[in-house]
Amino acid sequence: MVHLSTAQLIGYHVLTQRPPGHDSEAFFQQLSPEALYNHVFQQIDALRFFPQNIRYFLNLPVKVLINDDALLLKLCSSSSNITIKLQDPDIFYTLSTRQLSRLYKRIQQLEASGLPLWLDDFDEKMFATFSNKNWRLCGIKFDKKTFWHLVSELQKLRQAIFIGHKIATDVLMEGIETTEQRGIAFYAGATMEKDYLWPALLPDIY
């Protein structure tokens, strides 16, 4: 993750390496809530051996956050250099009013404990839903397809990022591949970027 105005490295997106040819999304979809819980904390434990002066962004399914009380408590006591990305915000549309209220309360609890929450793969169809709910988070990430769709229509891109800032402090664009696109994203109001234009530099393990 890179800051657009300074090109300063902000942090790393923590991913799970699967064997070649394996569908990662299908793998995680079939995992039980308990297995997902264990996976998240295996990642957190592994990060203790990496530099601590940088942020690490971890994916977390929305329903795991809603339903697992033990996970909430453990996250609240986790390292201050971790950011949680809710990886499936589209599931928002399937939640009941009670589940939405529970999710919002848990987001507030985590952020109050110093653990930032982001929405992953935000797209145009989510604008009205999230802004009308008056939810406020630390960050949102627009997926690369949304950026590529909007990059040639500057006014629409600016409007999308403006709405993004109503929901979150930081707006990250995925899919910037050229310095021209970087400039467009920056002047349209985005604050951060991941992948493509910058080399994938891995942190040294202690």
Regions found by a protein language model. Give the residues of each.
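Hydrophobic/aromatic residues located in beta-strands of well-ordered beta-sheets
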Residues: Y56, I82-I84, L117, V171
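EAL-family c-di-GMP phosphodiesterase catalytic domain
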Residues: M1-L9, T16-P20, Q87-S96, D120-K125, ...
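Conserved anion-binding
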Residues: S78, P89, I107-L115, D120, ...
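Acidic (Asp/Glu)-rich catalytic clusters
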Residues: I44-P51, N67-T83, S101-Q108, A112, ...
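Alpha-helix N-cap and loop-to-helix initiation/capping positions
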Residues: L31-A35, L95-R102, H149-S152
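N-terminal-biased segments
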Residues: R55-L72, E111, P116-K141
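Short, well-ordered alpha-helical scaffold segments within catalytic/effector domains
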Residues: Y37, F41, L100-Y104, L154-R158
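Bacterial c-di-GMP phosphodiesterase EAL domain
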Residues: M1-S78
